[in-house]
Amino acid sequence: TIDRTTNGRGRVCDITYDTIRRCVLKTGHGVKTSLKMPTLREALAVCKDRIAVNIDQGYEYYDLALAITEELGVTDQVLIKGKRPVETVSAKFAEYGHNMMYMPIIDILKPQGRELFEEYASKGVVPLAYEVCWDDYTPQVEACMRQVVAGGSKLWVNSLWDSLCGGLSDDKAFTESPDEVYGRLLDMGASIIQTDRPELLIRYLEAQGRRK
């Protein structure tokens, strides 16, 4: 839906393009801004040569998204995440000579997450990064993270919601202590932290001499 990020309501598939374009964006705290909803092409044009971009749910529209990234020359900046089997992703990427980055999402405490992680390991596939999700930091989670880093991939942690990071979320970093959140994530081996509070995270990383 467009509920979380704009002042509009409803599912994208039920709303016309013109209606969506009239919506304005909201801040992370739900406050309306004066910024109109951009198209993917407009957003990527602003990001070109500046930052990496994660297109959420982008795999479902890979062909359309890739056509735009190739047109703008930003394909190497764009990341797609998902939970699909290795061969499914490989087959899709084989259709093109130039692809966006792809990162598997591993819900390591769920059977399907463990199976996907084991599949990557058994096939000898080393993605650029894994997003590991967990709601309770168990020995199994710790072992998975260690294996990710030891295998040559980066460890991506999503700190947006408690259920994705065992309670080590942005809100806790803001209301309690950045060190208790971001410090612990770094100690776990995380080298990529997805955040809704970039200023807070950047200040912490710079203070620790950990920003690259």
What label would you give each PLM region?
Residues G30-K32, P111-K212:
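C-terminal active-site rim and adjoining tail of enzyme catalytic domains
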Residues T1-L109, V132-D135, V149-G151:
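Metal-dependent phosphodiesterase/phospholipase catalytic core, i.e.
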